[in-house]
C-alpha cells in the first residue's frame, strides 16, 4: 500500500518529510503534499483528519466530513474540539472585551452534526474517545463504511 499525507503549510510538509526520514522512512514510501483540504481528491482505504476542524465552523466542517468521506473506501477518522455550553459561554464573555481578541478563534463543533455528515456518506461510528491535555481537549471518532 501507499501513504499520502498533506498539510496546508508547505513548511509543515517539509518538517513531516524530514521527520519521516529520521524515522527510517525511505523516500517515496509516503507522498507528501502541501494542499488545502478542499483541493484533495483520490480514493484511499483510510482517511484521517486530525486537529484541523478547529478552523471550520459547523456547516463547513460537516461539508468537509462529507468530502473526506467521499475519498475513503473503508475508514474515516476525524478529531475536533467538541461544543460545550461552558466553552461557548466563556468565548462569548471574551468577545465582550474591547481591544485585541480575548477569545479563541478555534471553532467547537456539535458531535451530532459530524456524525450525521459521515452517516450521509455511508459511515457509522465504531469508536469514540476524548483526548485531554491541560489546555485542550478533542473528540476523536473512527467511522467505518457500512
Set out the residue ranges of the language-model regions.
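Class I (Rossmann-like) S-adenosyl-L-methionine-dependent methyltransferase catalytic domain
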Residues: 1-42, 59-67, 77-146
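Conserved acidic residues
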Residues: 45, 74
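A conserved beta-strand element that flanks and buttresses the S-adenosyl-L-methionine
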Residues: 48-49
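Hydrophobic adenine-recognition pocket in adenosine-nucleotide-binding enzymes
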Residues: 52
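Helix-to-beta-strand junctions that scaffold the AdoMet/dcAdoMet cofactor pocket
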Residues: 56-57, 72-73
Amino acid at each position: 500500500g501507499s501513504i499520502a499525507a498533506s498539510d496546508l503549510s508547505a513548511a509543515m510538509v517539509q518538517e513531516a518529510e524530514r521527520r519521516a526520514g529520521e524515522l527510517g522512512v525511505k523516500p517515496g514510501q509516503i507522498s507528501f503534499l502541501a494542499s488545502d483540504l478542499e483541493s484533495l481528491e483520490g480514493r484511499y482505504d483510510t482517511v484521517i483528519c486530525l486537529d484541523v476542524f478547529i478552523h471550520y465552523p459547523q456547516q463547513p466542517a460537516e461539508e468537509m466530513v462529507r468530502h473526506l468521506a467521499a475519498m475513503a473506501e473503508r475508514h474515516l477518522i476525524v478529531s475536533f474540539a467538541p461544543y460545550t455550553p461552558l466553552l461557548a459561554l466563556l468565548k462569548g464573555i471574551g468577545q465582550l472585551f474591547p481591544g485585541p481578541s480575548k477569545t479563541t478563534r478555534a471553532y467547537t463543533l456539535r458531535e451530532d452534526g459530524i456524525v450525521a455528515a459521515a452517516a450521509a456518506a455511508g459511515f457509522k461510528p465504531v469508536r469514540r474517545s476524548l483526548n485531554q491535555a491541560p489546555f485542550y481537549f478533542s473528540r476523536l471518532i473512527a467511522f467505518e463504511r457500512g
